[in-house]
Amino acid sequence: MILSFFHDRDEQQASYRYRGSIPSKYLDIPMGDESADVWVLSKITKASPALLAKAHRLGKRVIADVCDAHLSLPYYREVIEKADAITTPTSLLAEFIWEDLGRMATVIDDPYEFEEILPHVNGKNLLWFGHATNYSGLAMFREALAEYPLRMVSNIEGFIPWSKETMREEFSKADIVLLPDSAPTKSCNRAVEAIRQGCFVVATPHPSLDGLPGIWVGDFLKGVAWASAHPQEANERLMKSQAYVRVRFSPARVANAWKTLALACASSSAAAISPGKAGSTSIANEPVTAPTL
């Protein structure tokens, strides 16, 4: 077996799904298989240095998948410095790793998780979902959004608890998904899932949203007002978003990127892997051909 993903949490963690279980499913491989030639550490934790050392003792190659910008943490730095290859979900995080630690990283997108639903914008029902650490971005707009029905899914006490089935239900009720300010190194997976589920995305500017067609990025309140007042146009734009997402973020495409990198990692010296511009290469930089309206 060429590769296996290692993650010490469960599907409640987004990184477990996007950076482990989903590509594993499409490659038809088990997670945590120590017989694999290449081990992907899908979330760096305090236990990761020991796991990396074990892999190297067994003659395995290690890909460290860096999903958070915790580059000052000693165990993060140790894993990044000793891994045979580095991956990240965003080009900005790859640039930070290059600038701080001098390691090149390959950018591999998060795949989509949810099935595609026809666009269904037909009102002003709002949905926000995310970790408690991202709530501050929404909080600054709460008063200005008081006239809109707003539902919130999070691990914050009193909010709707997250589950995949809950998200399906909440997406089906929502017209517009809100993506206010969040950490600049985060991926666009929340926008992708909202698009897949037929909701129009209104967001403040974010690096990961660059090039994603059809969504509203800019004046946040103006975007909410426009989408709620122009449902037909919002749905037409959403169809463009879905066509793009269907190709770029397909689990099969992302899984193939992991397999390609693992094959290179298994057969090449670490210095030869992914020497792209600014320390990164990216499947996101490959042309994406998708139908447009």
Regions found by a protein language model. Give the residues of each.
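N-terminal pre-catalytic "stem/leader" segment of glycosyltransferase-like enzymes
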Residues: M1-P49, P251, S269, P291
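Conserved catalytic-core segment of nucleotide-activated headgroup transferases in glycan assembly
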Residues: D8-P23, F114-E116, N122-M167, R190
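Extended catalytic core of nucleotide-activated donor transferases of GT-like folds
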Residues: Y26-I97
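Hydrophobic acceptor-binding patch used for acceptor engagement in glycosyltransferases
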Residues: W39, I86, A174-L178, F200-V201
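Donor nucleotide-sugar binding/catalytic pocket of nucleotide-sugar-dependent glycosyltransferases
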Residues: D84-W98, G102-I117
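A charged, aromatic-enriched C-terminal amphipathic alpha-helix characteristic of glycosyltransferases
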Residues: E115, G123, Q232-S267, G276, ...
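Nucleotide-sugar-dependent
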Residues: T133, P161-E165, E169, D175-R196, ...
